[in-house]
């Protein structure tokens, strides 16, 4: 038989309250103490990935052009001594006058003498002598009882003499001739657009240089353009990721 059947329903809460009061006050069970400990463990993991790109090298030819202007001042003085003019001059970096000219041999301007035409003499002479000798044969003389002398013509010698003598003299004056050389300038390069400051030093880049020789003339082909600011650097990309994991143990 159950106790709940013996105790009326209105007395059941009172019975439970009495059982709670009769429980021991400490938690000891056979000298064993139960302690609950809560521990939190934090674990951090870091992964680093490095990606290296291909390294490229670019070489630029930079030509810096600067212009510097120099100013020179010249003073000249001409004096006549015994009818012979002498010219003296001086050059300085500051303004000078005729009073600053020192008449000495170092400052004298000497004109170079003009060259006279070169005289070439050519002489040509020819002499020829022709002599011709023609002998005449003697006729034979026959002997007879009655001998009649036959006149014998005298030996005749014909001499022909011809003397030719001529002397020709030719004088030629060599004159100096001046030939003007025509200078031609051809510009086939690219046209540079945009304003360029006169206060700065500009740079140009020259690339793809090649030479070709044709008929004794050397042609140089190259590409050039105005150089602006260029950044030549080796790029390396680094990716870094951090993974954090928190583990809680009860």
Swiss-Prot record:
Any one Gene Ontology cellular component term annotated for this protein? plasma membrane
Q: Which residues form the propeptide in this entry?
A: 232-250
- Transmembrane spans: none
Q: Does the keyword Nucleotide-binding apply?
A: no
Q: Where is the composition biased (Low complexity)?
A: 111-173
Briefly explain the null phenotype. Affects yeast-to hyphal transition.
Listed A to Z, the keywords are:
Cell adhesion, Cell membrane, Glycoprotein, GPI-anchor, Lipoprotein, Membrane, Secreted, Signal, Virulence
Localization (cell)? Secreted; Cell membrane
Q: Where is this region: Disordered?
A: 99-175
According to its UniProt entry, one GO biological process term is: filamentous growth of a population of unicellular organisms in response to biotic stimulus
Q: Using the record, list the residue span of the signal peptide; answer none if the entry has no such feature.
A: 1-22
Provide the lipid-modification sites (GPI-anchor amidated aspartate): 231
Question: What's the protein's topology in the membrane?
Answer: Lipid-anchor; GPI-anchor
Q: Which superkingdom is the protein from?
A: Eukaryota
Q: Its biological function?
A: Putative adhesin which may be involved in cell adhesion and virulence. Involved in the regulation of filamentous growth.
Q: What is this protein called?
A: Filamentous growth regulator 41
Q: What is the lineage of its organism?
A: Eukaryota, Fungi, Dikarya, Ascomycota, Saccharomycotina
